[in-house]
């Protein structure tokens, strides 16, 4: 499954989200406690996971909406869950860091108006199914890392642990 790709499953910082009250905020400006628009309403951000990109570059798909997302991060597009790489062109671009989120509920955050799945979502349908990103295992790992208690974990590239088949099995805090 492509969802097992070891590249960062995240959003570029210049993508945007709507916060409660109707304001539009860049993803790299969101903090724990912000209440963001989800597919089904609003949810509070529990934790922001900021991952620095190797050599300041990463593969990104930029959609017409302005959503800049890694190629294998599931999004809800035209009535179904899809990988961005199947919708737009993958480009290796300058990007200092990418961002992921742990939400309190409704684990489908709207980024540039597109529902995007978040860590620990618990869904097991189609491409959303993931034995790590989609389960509480990732949340358990994040809870052990410096920054969880303040809602901001900063990771370096290479933080994703894979098995001998290249399947994502964990995150490692690497300073």
Regions from the PLM with identified roles:
Residues 1-175:
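HINT/intein-family self-processing domains that catalyze protein splicing or autoproteolytic maturation
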């Amino acid at each position: 499954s492509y969802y097992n790709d070891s590249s960062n499953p995240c959003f570029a910082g210049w993508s945007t989200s709507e916060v409660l009250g109707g304001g539009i905020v860049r993803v790299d400006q969101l903090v724990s406690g912000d209440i963001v628009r989800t597919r089904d309403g609003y949810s509070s951000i529990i934790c922001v996971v900021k991952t620095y990109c190797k050599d300041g570059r990463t593969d990104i798909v930029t959609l017409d909406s302005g959503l800049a997302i890694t190629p294998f991060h599931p999004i809800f597009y035209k009535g179904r869950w899809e990988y961005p790489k199947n919708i737009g062109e993958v480009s290796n671009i300058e990007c200092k860091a990418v961002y992921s989120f742990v939400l309190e509920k409704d684990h489908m955050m709207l980024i540039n108006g597109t529902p995007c799945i978040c860590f620990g979502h618990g869904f097991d349908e189609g491409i959303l199914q993931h034995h790590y990103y989609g389960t509480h295992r990732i949340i358990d790992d994040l809870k052990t890392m410096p920054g969880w208690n303040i809602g901001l974990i900063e990771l370096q590239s290479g933080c994703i642990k894979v098995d001998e088949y290249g399947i994502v099995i964990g995150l490692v805090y690497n300073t």
